[in-house]
Amino acid sequence: MKMFFLVYPDYFDTRITSEVKQAGYKKYTKVRGTTGAGDETSPKLGTPHAPGKNNILLIAVPDEEIPHLLEFVRKMRRDHPTGGFRAFTFPLEECI
């Protein structure tokens, strides 16, 4: 098992949630209103000087589903190069 961890701009929330559900993922955890800075886009700190916020989506999936999810993120990054999409995967040792 892996933990798929996706950081994305809040203004893409409806689309991301819809795509995830259409792909068959009914169970996930969403953290809304996160802030951060990266090296490819402007910071999203929720302030007048760095407006905007991110959301985080976490999905526990079998290893073989990770390539499909990563390809979805690659497509979003191609379609929206300044969007600020970032995906991470982690080994998931246990889920209770």
List the model feature ranges, each with a label.
Residues M1-I96:
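Positively charged, small/polar-rich N-terminal and surface patches that mediate targeting and assembly
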